[in-house]
Every structure is written in structure tokens, then in C-alpha cells.
A protein has these predicted regions:
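Non-catalytic structural scaffold of enzyme domains
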Residues: 24-172
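Intrinsically disordered, glycine-rich low-complexity segments
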Residues: 13-14, 25
């Protein structure tokens, strides 16, 4: 009887312990930290997506997560536009270190705008922070490069080759 699949996040990728050589059960059960609240709905949506894309057959097979919902985080767009980001970065540092002290193996930040400060935030902690925009590009390119993706469909990789990618953006 094969073990039930267990997925964990690492650099934005999910791994199945049945099919991933070198992944131990301990590694599969690493804790994911989330710096959220910058868009409470974005945090809620991210949490929902992690749960939906975890191959779990019971509650105990889900990823342990610490969600730090910091709705009072200083405005990211204002920090970008004015260059006044000391308070924002101090708060991000506090959050990253809190998640590190709680034993999180990886940190996700569902707020895309926060990734403008990714390098500074990453410098505050030894815990790898998942760079969501880069992972989105990796996801899109996987379909374009692979032709037909050979990735696990449970990871929601593109089923068809990607021929065009649209980009929308703002000043912050």
C-alpha cells in the first residue's frame, strides 16, 4: 500500500513525497509562513489555493502554515512612489523574523506589490522567501518551453503550450 501524497511548498513548487526522490516525510511537513493582510482577500485567496492544491486525504496531510495577517502594514504603493519605505521595511523585518522564530521553512507574501522590496525583505531572514512574480513567470514559461507540460496536473501547470503572455501593471 503506497503512502498518501504529501505536498509542501518550496520556492513556489509543490512536491509529492511518492514521486520526489530525496524528499523525506520531515521535509514534506515543513511549515510555511505567510506575511499576509496586505489585501486581506489576497491572503485568504492564497490560503485557499494552498489548501486546494495540497494532495491531502485527511487534515493531517495538509501543510502546517503560520499566517501573519498584518493589515496595518504601511502602504506599499506609497512607499514605492515616495521612496519613504523605512517604516514598511521595519514592519516586514519584524514579520519575517517572527515567522523565522516560529520555525517556518519558507515564507510566502501574497501581495505582489511587496515583491518590489523582495531583496531587502529576504535580507532580514535566512528563511527562503518565495518570489511570487518569478514563480508566475516560471509557471507560464513551463508551458512554452515544455510544449506540453509534463508536470503533475494537480499543480495547475498549463495543459497546453503558452504562446502569448499578457502583462498588466501599475506604478506601484
Amino acid at each position: 500500500m503506497s503512502a498518501a501524497p504529501v505536498r509542501f511548498a518550496s520556492g513556489g513548487r509543490g512536491y509529492d513525497t511518492r514521486n520526489c526522490v530525496g524528499v523525506t516525510k520531515e521535509a514534506a511537513m515543513e511549515k510555511l509562513g505567510v506575511i499576509g493582510g496586505m489585501g486581506a482577500e489576497a491572503t485568504s485567496y492564497y490560503y485557499d489555493q494552498v489548501v486546494r492544491h495540497t494532495a491531502a486525504t485527511c487534515d493531517q496531510e495538509h501543510i502546517d502554515m503560520v499566517v501573519l495577517s498584518k493589515s496595518t502594514m504601511p502602504d506599499r504603493t506609497l512607499a514605492i512612489k515616495t521612496g519613504e519605505h523605512a517604516e514598511l521595511l521595519a514592519t516586514m523585518k519584524e514579520c519575517a523574523r517572527a515567522l523565522e522564530s516560529l520555525g517556518c521553512a519558507h515564507i510566502a507574501i501574497p501581495c505582489n506589490t511587496s515583491h518590489y522590496f523582495y531583496d531587502q525583505i529576504q535580507s532580514f531572514t535566512k528563511v527562503p522567501i518565495i518570489h511570487m512574480p518569478r514563480e508566475s513567470v516560471r509557471y507560464a514559461l513551463a508551458g512554452a518551453v515544455m510544449g506540453e507540460c509534463e508536470f503533475d496536473p494537480n499543480l495547475s501547470m498549463p495543459a497546453e503550450p503558452v504562446h502569448k503572455i499578457g502583462i498588466m501593471g501599475t506604478d506601484g
